[in-house]
Amino acid sequence: PNGGLMKAVARAWFWRGAETLGSMAAKPAARLLDEMDFLAVVLASAGLIVRGQWRFLFGHTVQQIYFTAVQRAYLFTVVGSIIGALMAFPLIVFRIHDPALLGRIMHIMMYHQLNPILAALFVTGLSGSAITAELGEIKANQAIDHLAAMGVDPHGFFVLPRLLGMILSLPILTCWLNVGVTVGAAAMLDIYQNVPLPIFLGVCASGLSYPSLALTGAMVVTQAIHIILVQSSRAFRVRAYVDIPRALPGAFAQSFVGCLIVSLLFSLIRYG
C-alpha cells in the first residue's frame, strides 16, 4: 500500500511539474500573440485618422523624436566613449595590434551586437518607462475612455506617434552610441597600443557593408517596435494610479528581454 501511495504521489508531482513547465513555455507565445494583436490595432488606427489629425500626428511624432533622440544624443555619445574606453582595455591586455583585427572586433562585438542592446536598454529605461507612466496616468484618469466615447481612436492618438518616434529615434541613438564607442576605443588604443587614430577609424569605416548595416537597422527597428508595444500595452491595462508603479518593472523587464531575443534571432540570421 505504501508503495502504491508513493507512486501516486510521484505521478501527481510529475504531472503537476509538466503542467507548470507547459504553462511557462506557453507564456512567451501568448505574449507574442498579444503584441501582434496590439500592433494590428495600432496600424489599423492609422487608417482611421482623418485629414485634420495628420498635422497633430506629425507634430507629436517630431516631439517624441526630440525628447527621445535629440535631447539624449550628448548622453549617448559620452556613455559610448566610456564604454569604448573600457572595451579597449582587454584588447590592450591581450596585445592585439593588428588594425584589421581590431576593426573586425568592433564590427562583430560592438556595432552589430552590444551597442544595439545597450541602446535598447537605455531607451527602455529612460523613454520607455516614461511612456508607460504617462499613458498609465492618462488611462487612470479615464481620458482614454473619454476620447473613445468622442469617436477618437486612442491607439492612433497616443500610441502611433510614439511608435513612429521610437522607430526613428532608436537607430539615431544607436548611431550616436557607435560614434562614442569608436572614439573612446580609438583614444585608448592610440595611447596604449600606438594604433594611429586615422588608421583605426579607417578600418572601422571600411568594414561596414550595406547588407550588414541593413540587417542591423532592421534589428534596431524591430526592437523599437517591441519596446513601444510592450510599454503602451502595459499602460493601457492600468485601472488606477496604484497600478502604475506595479506596471513599470514588468514592462521594463519584458521589453529588455524581448530586445535580447530579437538580437539573438538576428544574430542567428547573420552568422548562422
Task: Give the ranges of each region predicted by the language model.
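Active-site cofactor/substrate anionic-group-binding motifs, chiefly glycine-
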Residues: Y66-L118, F122
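Membrane-interfacial helix-loop-helix connectors in multipass membrane proteins
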Residues: P90-L114, W176-V221, L229-G250, R270-G272
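A hydrophobic alpha-helix feature that marks transmembrane segments and, especially
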Residues: L121-K139
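Short cytoplasmic-facing helical segments at TM-TM junctions of multi-pass membrane proteins
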Residues: L135-L160, I244
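Final/C-terminal transmembrane alpha-helix of multipass membrane proteins
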Residues: I244, G250-L268
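Short, membrane-interfacial amphipathic segments enriched in basic
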Residues: K7-H60
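Selective transmembrane-helix segments that form parts of the transport pathway or gating/packing helices
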Residues: A69, A73, T77, F158-G180, ...
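Membrane-interface helix starts
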Residues: R51-V62, Y66-V78, F256-V257
